[in-house]
C-alpha cells in the first residue's frame, strides 16, 4: 500500500519507448475509445497483466483456499462485465486491453448513443452531464458494473440532455422513414 503521502503510479510503461507497431496499435485504441493519453492504455494493460498473473498463479493449485480465490477472481471479472458468467479460469489468460476499455463509462456512454463520438462522451462525463444511479460521475475511466449499464443517463438539469435527446429522436425518425 505504501505511504499516503507517496502515491504510486497505477501503470507500467512499455519496455521500449520507440516500438513502431506498439505505437500504431496504441494510436488506434486512442482514436477508437477517445482516450486522452497513452497512460490510460497502459493502466488497462497493467490490469490485464495483473489478472493474467493471478490466473496463472491460481492454475497451479488445486487446494480449497485456491478454489475460493478462483471464484473470487472470476466473480469480480463477471461483475465488471469483462468476462461472461460461468467463464473458466483459462479465459482470463485471453483478456485484452480492449476488454477493459469497453467497460469504461466513457465507452458505454458512446455505445448507448448518448454521445455522437467517444471524445464527446468523455466531455459529457467530465463536465458532469452523465449520471449513474442518479449520481454524477466525473471520471471517464470509471469501470461500469454489468448491472449498472441501464442506469446511465443524463443529469436531469443538464442543458445538453434535451438537445441530445431531440437529436436522437430526429435520427430515429429518419431511420424509420427509410
Curated annotation (Swiss-Prot):
<keyword id="KW-0689">Ribosomal protein</keyword>
<dbReference type="InterPro" id="IPR018079">
    <property type="entry name" value="Ribosomal_uS4_CS"/>
</dbReference>
<feature type="region of interest" description="Disordered">
    <location>
        <begin position="1"/>
        <end position="20"/>
    </location>
</feature>
<dbReference type="GO" id="GO:0042274">
    <property type="term" value="P:ribosomal small subunit biogenesis"/>
</dbReference>
<keyword id="KW-0699">rRNA-binding</keyword>
<dbReference type="InterPro" id="IPR036986">
    <property type="entry name" value="S4_RNA-bd_sf"/>
</dbReference>
<keyword id="KW-0687">Ribonucleoprotein</keyword>
<dbReference type="Pfam" id="PF01479">
    <property type="entry name" value="S4"/>
</dbReference>
<dbReference type="InterPro" id="IPR001912">
    <property type="entry name" value="Ribosomal_uS4_N"/>
</dbReference>
<dbReference type="InterPro" id="IPR022801">
    <property type="entry name" value="Ribosomal_uS4"/>
</dbReference>
<comment type="similarity">
    <text>Belongs to the universal ribosomal protein uS4 family.</text>
</comment>
<feature type="domain" description="S4 RNA-binding">
    <location>
        <begin position="103"/>
        <end position="170"/>
    </location>
</feature>
<comment type="function">
    <text>One of the primary rRNA binding proteins, it binds directly to 16S rRNA where it nucleates assembly of the body of the 30S subunit.</text>
</comment>
<comment type="function">
    <text>With S5 and S12 plays an important role in translational accuracy.</text>
</comment>
<protein>
    <recommendedName>
        <fullName>Small ribosomal subunit protein uS4</fullName>
    </recommendedName>
</protein>
<dbReference type="InterPro" id="IPR022802">
    <property type="entry name" value="Ribosomal_uS4_arc"/>
</dbReference>
<dbReference type="GO" id="GO:0015935">
    <property type="term" value="C:small ribosomal subunit"/>
</dbReference>
<comment type="subunit">
    <text>Part of the 30S ribosomal subunit. Contacts protein S5. The interaction surface between S4 and S5 is involved in control of translational fidelity.</text>
</comment>
<dbReference type="GO" id="GO:0019843">
    <property type="term" value="F:rRNA binding"/>
</dbReference>
<feature type="compositionally biased region" description="Basic residues">
    <location>
        <begin position="1"/>
        <end position="11"/>
    </location>
</feature>
<dbReference type="GO" id="GO:0003735">
    <property type="term" value="F:structural constituent of ribosome"/>
</dbReference>
<dbReference type="InterPro" id="IPR005710">
    <property type="entry name" value="Ribosomal_uS4_euk/arc"/>
</dbReference>
<dbReference type="GO" id="GO:0006412">
    <property type="term" value="P:translation"/>
</dbReference>
<keyword id="KW-0694">RNA-binding</keyword>
<dbReference type="InterPro" id="IPR002942">
    <property type="entry name" value="S4_RNA-bd"/>
</dbReference>
